[in-house]
Swiss-Prot record:
This is tRNA uridine 5-carboxymethylaminomethyl modification enzyme MnmG. It is found in: Cytoplasm. It comes from Streptococcus pyogenes serotype M28 (strain MGAS6180). Homodimer. Heterotetramer of two MnmE and two MnmG subunits. Its cofactor is FAD. Keywords: Cytoplasm, FAD, Flavoprotein, NAD, tRNA processing. Coiled coil: none annotated. Its main location: cytoplasm. GO terms for molecular function: flavin adenine dinucleotide binding. NAD(+) binds at residues 276-290. Belongs to the MnmG family. FAD binds at G15, A16, G17, H18, A19, G20, I127, S182, Q373. GO terms for cellular component: cytosol.
Length: 632
């Protein structure tokens, strides 16, 4: 079929949420002429649910996005109202930043960034179809009948894909926050042959700040020392005038109201068909599943400086409006609270992610990429991370350059994508630190050390960032080398000082680095014995030094495991392999291999239901069969 195109682009991104913004900024910054198409320009980078960025695992993803040259970290650093480091009482592997956002300012600031980006056209339009010829993307069709040519298309439609809002007995077609749903595109994605799933998520009511009795709640302030998501943000820019959040709880009266109205709850009446998020359940689901709990935490989170709206985190619900009001008024501090928005549930279509490659390109259609909630994830951060990788790979494909695949040992983003494409997901996927087997080397403090060079190689890290990174890396390397070369000897003067500090005396000579491995010895104490570095070191470099030195043994073990897995990841599996021709593989493994069509032995080994014997048989088969090949 010959198409008459009115406009032509290298890449078209459909949807301007957190995934779409990162995808389009990446492609345009890499030199591709890009169109970012969205149903509503006023909702670009909008936060339809929680007014926050980061959190456990998610905060590390934002740092990874920043290290690669993405935008989310820089944007939240400009627009937050509170910043907090989580899990400070635990090990470095699970520490992560979380920021309360001024949600309207966050969206406005991101829109400004997109509007001034070279090579990037922003258009309010609805895309109804993906145009495909001979198994390859050639463009898109708008609802008004316009055809735009493209060499690659990235679908980042979020919860708008055949979205339906559910509130009590009411159910109607809608995207998030009463925006338009994308119904025709959902139909046409299915017609293209993609397998489609149906998920559900929800959001809590918002209450008016001036109607809250804060005396009945517990204040939750931000940190009083500088912290940032972006490695380029300066401590001098740290916000001192932060806005606190507040903690309250449900109670028995709250639970009674919910239990008495379960017959009206869409979650239990059969109205909701989609699968909801395990790690962010509705309040009615929590009351039923955890009936023994006397109360549940609720955090009152301001949505910005210039609004009275307060987000009631932990109270996600689709109960009828009258029940939501009674529920709110049963809660301490909210007895007279004015509900400004009701909570609701939203159901939406997803593209089942086992159909994707680790580049986030669909296996079925060349040049078609998907990212974000379209792939079955939950959360702004997960969406942004996928959007960045999908955008990078769309640009690399257009330019005929080698693709970028982040491994599980490279980044939490790599863990997430590998989980999605290898295991699929039966519910909205959320990143957790427990999902990462190499979490000690995937830390908040070393994201730039892991990923900045990759960002530079693909063209997303500019000269200013690269110079700052080189300075930091050189300072780190030089100081680590110095600490490993200077020795402390067990002489009387040294041991007298050690004992004065309340520490065990030295029995043998040791390097300053070995001295720092002692749990009680921090960097400041060590340099008080051996003298300071040649130049003043930033606090973040000192933090990195302490972690790398104190956990060196564990880090080395993790890196050994990475090296072993790398050998498996390098063993490619041909795309045209005949799984039925491999004798002795278990039936379940054969079925999973056919469904997922893994690209490497490493990926095959992580598929649920596949055991080591199946992998051994597969490796023997591949060694004796060199005719097959993988081509995309």
């Amino acid at each position: 079929m010959t198409h008459e195109f009115t406009e032509s682009y290298d890449v078209i991104v459909i949807g301007a949420g957190h995934a779409g913004v990162e995808a389009s900024l990446a492609t345009s910054r890499m030199g591709c002429k890009t169109l970012l198409a969205t149903i509503n320009l006023d909702m670009l980078a909008f936060m339809p649910c929680n007014p926050s960025i980061g959190g456990s695992a998610k905060g590390i993803v934002v740092r990874e996005i920043d290290a690669l040259g993405g935008e989310m970290g820089k944007n939240i650093d400009k627009t937050y109202i509170q910043m907090k480091m989580l899990n400070t009482g635990k090990g470095p592997a699970v520490r992560a930043l979380r920021a309360q956002a001024d949600k309207s300012l966050y969206a406005r600031e991101m829109k400004h960034t997109v509007e001034k980006q070279a090579n990037l056209t922003l258009r309010q339009t609805m895309i109804d179809d993906i145009l495909v010829e001979d198994g390859r993307v050639v463009g898109v069709l708008t609802a008004t009948g316009q055809k735009f040519a493209a060499k690659a298309v990235v679908v980042t439609t979020g919860t708008a894909l055949r979205g339906e809002i559910i509130l009590g007995e009411l159910k109607y077609s809608s995207g998030p926050n009463n925006s338009l749903a994308s119904v025709t595109l959902a139909d046409n994605l299915k017609k293209l042959g993609l397998e489609i799933g149906r998920f559900k998520t929800g959001t809590p009511p918002r209450v008016k700040a001036s109607s809250i009795n804060y005396d009945q709640t517990e204040i939750q302030p931000g940190d009083d020392k500088p912290n940032h998501f972006s490695f380029m943000s300066k401590d001098a820019e740290y916000l001192k005038d932060q806005i606190p959040c507040w903690l309250t709880y449900t109670n028995q009266t709250s639970h009674d109201i919910i239990n008495q109205n379960l017959y009206r709850a869409p979650m239990f009446s059969g109205i909701v068909k989609g699968v909801g998020p395990r790690y962010c359940p509705s309040i009615e689901d929590k009351i039923v599943r955890f009936a023994d709990k006397e109360r549940h935490q609720l955090f009152l989170e301001p949505e910005g400086r210039d609004t009275e709206e307060v987000y009631v985190q932990g109270l996600s619900t689709s109960l009828p409006e009258d029940v939501q009001k009674d529920l709110i008024h049963s809660i301490k501090g909210l007895e007279k609270a004015e509900m400004m928005r009701t909570g609701y549930a939203i159901e939406y279509d997803i593209v089942l992610p086992h159909q994707l490659r680790a580049t986030l390109e669909t296996k079925l259609i060349s040049g078609l990429f998907t990212a974000g909630q379209t792939n079955g994830t939950s959360g702004y951060e997960e969406a942004a991370g996928q959007g960045l990788i999908a955008g990078i790979n769309a640009a690399l494909k257009v330019q005929g350059k080698p693709e970028l695949i982040l491994k599980r040992s490279d980044a939490y983003i790599g863990v997430m994508i590998d989980d999605l494409v290898t295991k699929g997901t039966l519910e909205p996927y959320r990143l957790l630190t427990s999902r990462a087997e190499y979490r000690l080397i995937l830390r908040h403090d070393n994201a730039d050390m892991r990923l900045t060079e990759i960002g530079r190689d693909i063209g997303l890290v500019d000269d200013e960032r690269w110079k700052a990174f080189e300075i930091k890396k050189n300072q780190f390397d030089n100081e680590l080398k110095r600490l490993n070369s200077i020795k402390l000897k067990p002489v009387k003067a040294t041991n007298d000082r050690v004992q004065e500090l309340g520490f065990k005396p030295l029995t043998d000579a040791m390097t300053a680095k070995e001295f720092m491995r002692r749990p009680e010895i921090d960097y400041a104490t060590a340099v008080s014995f051996v003298g300071p570095a040649a130049e003043d070191l930033d606090a973040k470099i000192i933090e990195l030094l302490e972690t790398e030195i104190k956990y060196e043994g564990y880090i080395r073990k993790a890196l050994d495991q990475v090296a072993k897995m790398k050998r498996m990841e390098e063993k490619r599996i041909p795309a045209n392999i005949d799984w039925d021709a491999i004798d002795s593989i278990a039936t379940e493994a054969r079925q999973k291999f056919k469904k997922i069509n893994p690209e490497t032995i490493g990926q095959a080994s992580r598929i649920s239901g596949v055991n080591p014997a199946d992998i051994s048989i597969l490796m023997i088969y591949l060694e004796g069969n060199g005719k097959a090949h993988r081509k995309y």
